[in-house]
Amino acid sequence: HRIVPCPDCKLQPEWMNALARRACALLEANGIAPYDEETGKGRVRHLYMRQGWHSGQRLLCFVVNGNGLPNEAEICRTLQQEFLLTTVLINRNPARTNVILGRDTRTVLGPGVIEDTLAGVPIQMGVHEFYQVNTPAAELLYAKAKEFARLQPDDFLLDLYCGMGTIGLSMKPHCRRLVGVEVVPQAVEGAKTVAAHLGLPPEEADFYCMDAGEA
């Protein structure tokens, strides 16, 4: 990869562009260098931002080559206050790879997740869970998928590669049982939490952490 300036991306909310510019200025002021894939040196690999479409809640995660940032508390608090962030996290990724996220994430400020709804399903998400970036389009696709499925009250619905389970859970009122399969542990736990929040016992909606090809 080559790092190039992109101060005004048209595909994301303007606050994300403004935060990226401000964060880069703070990092430079603190002498914190960006990560270089070729040398494996430098601290900051990515700025990872999310926003709940309906809730408006905002998440920021620094993906770092190391355990954290110099002056971490001050930098994170400044950005949280200036951009009304719901939560700020640090993800540790020391591997020589172009994979974005590492395994270890810790919360610096806030609850560690943001909340939103998707097709009427309440969700909580951190950084590891897959989330459609265009929520209105996703909700239209969910509705079309439900129409094509033509579910009946006694049907068994298998949701493969289910992520947080939003597709299956949005269709659960129209079938007898739902089983979701997903390889990301955090997403599976999130799906189970949502199902419990909706009052669905495991015998009606359950989720398994495994490879869908082996399910």
Question: Which residues make up each language-model segment?
Answer:
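SAM-dependent transferase fold signal centered on methyltransferase-like domains
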Residues: 1-106, 143, 147-154
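Rossmann-like S-adenosyl-L-methionine
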Residues: 71-82, 86-215
